[in-house]
Amino acid sequence: MKKAVLCMVTLLLCLCAIAAQAQALTLTGLETESVAREWENHAFFERMRELTGVEMEAHGIEDEAEYRKMLAAMEGGTITADVLFKASLSREEEIGLLNSGAIIDLAPLIEENMPNLSALLSAHPEWKQVIELEDGRIASLPQLTQEPRQVCVWINSAWLGSLGIDMPRTVDELTQALVKMAGADLNGNGKADEIPADLLGVYEMRWLLPFFGVIADDYNVAREDDGTWVFAPELAGYREFVKTLREWYELGVLPRKAFTESHGAIALAGNDNDTVVSGLIVAVAPYTNVPGSAVFDYAPLLIADPDGQTRWRDLLGGVWTGCFAVTSACPDPASAMRWADALYEQESAIVAYAGVQGEDYDINADGYWYFLVDNYRTINDIRSNAIIYTGETMHGFVPNAFLNRVDSEQDRYVLENSAKVLAVSERVVEPYALGEQTRARLNELAASIGSEVDKGIARFVTGEMELTDENWESWLSGMREAGSEELTALLNAAK
């Protein structure tokens, strides 16, 4: 009798376990894709259920204000979902949600439930440092990649060829090349509409800084060889950078409305959209600024600095945090983590990026993959119903080996050149170097000082303020008073 009762109890426990595993978890997040995408009926979630055995009842929120309002309500105790996917959490939001008890610390769950992510973090301990808070807690899961796309300075090499000019190796050679572009009808439309340095505002102009030996980030700080952080405008190379921009402005290389107009706005106002007007651009890919047919006319420009070193700034790095979180309302955090772990395995991650082979994409005889589109199913249909990585950033390990084999010569060309730039790129300030209070103060200082940096550069370049020793020192002095020295002191204390 006792044996029968024991067997019955065991059976009931097993049935309860099965029921718990079969219970669908509720999932929500921010969806910013431009095409309509309904998570409730999206193929991705059913395919993930087939891969993991974990079912998600998904609902995407398209209005960012509504989504941020939901996050604020979570901090106040109103939790309406078990999982946040494409969560778009800032570090401040992560900390607030954790401290309020709205989301749980994922650190204790990773090793047991996420073998794929565990292996990646073991191989790249620096990645773990980025996702951990200063107390060791982990609020969210990241997107990881070994090949982060690079912002590049692209130069119109076709125009260089037409002018009989080699790829510039120095800033002086670059200036000479751009001056020659300004005086030639290189697009052949009979108009003087060429823009040699088609740069939009100070942000894009700052991507020229590595040519002057300055690798600076959005805090306007640079790192010396000994690891010490300095305020970038204090460096000699920074003044040379501003001096060169002033020269370009006077020579007509930099357009008069460089600080007020969008890319090629003046020229394109009177031209066909297929007309190439740009000599030098800053972009991840040329086709974001110029006609797609002209992509192969552009090559990334890397110029050695005065010390002979070729260096670049890696904008994003290999880790993007805030992508996936588990709420305190989740009845089965382990299952949520197992579901999430599938996207840290390359083959499984392809489901999010390209769908299923034979249904959404296929591979040709040359080994390149392509989407299966026809008169009845467009690429927008696939974006809407099959893939989900576009829009807000999702967690997982980007399947670069697969994506790099796309059946698009333009995309492969851009990816190959991005990899070349990545090889000489470096991060300036790693996020894990900063504690909560330090980061908050740095952001406050960077906002006020950054505005003064941009305004000062614009005034020097346009000639509103003459570039003299006195004016330069006065500008630097004003930024010291605004907190530039405190900015670098905070960073150096956090090393």
Language-model segment annotations:
Residues C7-A17:
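Bacterial N-terminal signal peptides
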